[in-house]
């Protein structure tokens, strides 16, 4: 899985900064209990045409991606609940969440 995001580089004096953000979509009911507020834009990394289009810096028309901004799961995911950000050990069974 790849996440759809944006980045921008800034030059401030001698320092170059890069900022990033992950694009979010409306929540998906299949992710209730995991992430209820929004769904990150998930791109199917095996769809090489989509990935190439996403990474093409000459493509500036965001309408080409409107169909992806629905919150629909475009790819199946596997999720394992963990104890916390500092303890990545599993605290439950792994779930298979099938794409829409």
Feature roles, as predicted:
Residues 1-100:
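Short linear sequence motif anchored by a di-proline
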């Amino acid at each position: 899985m790849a996440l759809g995001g944006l980045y921008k580089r800034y030059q401030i004096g001698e320092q170059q900064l890069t900022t990033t953000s992950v694009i979010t979509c409306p929540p998906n009911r299949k992710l209730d209990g995991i992430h209820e507020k929004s769904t990150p834009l998930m791109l199917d990394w095996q769809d090489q045409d989509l990935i190439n289009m996403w990474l093409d810096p000459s493509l500036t028309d965001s309408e080409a991606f409107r169909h992806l901004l629905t919150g629909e799961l475009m790819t199946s995911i596997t999720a394992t609940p963990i104890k916390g950000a500092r303890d990545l050990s599993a605290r439950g069974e792994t779930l298979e969440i099938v794409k829409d």
